[in-house]
């Protein structure tokens, strides 16, 4: 289950055992739905079998008109960038910095999420949105998709410590804010993403990404204690 304070994001987390990401087109009750459900790319066991269990992935549609599913992730992004209303042209909802999570504070960037047996708190350490010109392989890279795709020049390699460090560095560099958190290569990660707000065609590669690490309870699954270095976030 995912529930983010100050938003209407409050949904069960689903997983399609067929591996076909079927909850993109059906709701949590299995009924056909254009809004879909919140779902994992792979459950923990499957992700572990592919060697990508260190980065679990959660996604849902950006239901802009109804302002549901993961649309309000954009509100979190925008209010933390100093915006006062939703950037989507048909939303324009006023954004209250006193209600939406303040990612500069530990309380605001720490979210309670329970997925496939992991019931814990997760800390946001990077977030950013890419536009419709972004290479498609970014989605594969960010989510550690465990299969080659020659058409977009993506080659899957089972992550090792060097890859994880490179991946962390890439996400920190691209983050739209310095949140003052530097993850460890031994952390348990969670990548959450949804479609972009202003580049929203069916074939667009625009996405909004949030990168989190498990902090409570601290994960030791990948050799660490989930400790991280925190500095003062940039103003």
What are these regions (language model features)?
Residues 1-235:
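Solvent-exposed, non-transmembrane regions of membrane-associated and secreted proteins
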């Amino acid at each position: 289950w995912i529930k983010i304070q100050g938003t209407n994001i409050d949904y069960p987390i689903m997983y399609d055992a067929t591996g076909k990401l079927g909850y993109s087109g059906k709701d949590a009750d299995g009924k056909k739905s254009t809004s879909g459900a919140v779902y994992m790319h792979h459950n923990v066991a499957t992700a572990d079998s592919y060697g990508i269990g260190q980065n679990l992935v959660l996604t849902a549609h950006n239901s802009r008109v109804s302002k549901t599913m993961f649309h309000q992730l954009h509100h979190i992004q925008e209010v933390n960038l100093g915006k006062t209303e939703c950037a989507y042209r048909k939303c324009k909802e006023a954004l209250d910095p006193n209600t939406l999570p303040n990612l500069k504070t530990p309380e605001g960037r720490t979210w309670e999420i329970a997925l496939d047996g992991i019931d814990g708190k997760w800390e946001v350490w990077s977030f950013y949105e890419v536009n419709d010109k972004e290479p498609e392989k970014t989605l594969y890279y960010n989510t550690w998709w465990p299969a080659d795709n020659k058409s977009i020049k993506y080659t899957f390699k089972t992550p090792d410590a060097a890859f994880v460090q490179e991946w962390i560095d890439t996400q920190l560099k691209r983050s739209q804010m310095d949140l003052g958190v530097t993850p460890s290569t031994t952390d348990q990660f969670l990548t959450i993403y949804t479609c972009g707000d202003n580049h929203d065609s069916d074939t667009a590669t625009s996405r909004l990404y949030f990168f989190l690490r498990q902090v409570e309870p601290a994960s030791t699954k990948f050799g660490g204690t989930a400790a991280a270095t925190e500095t003062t976030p940039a103003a």
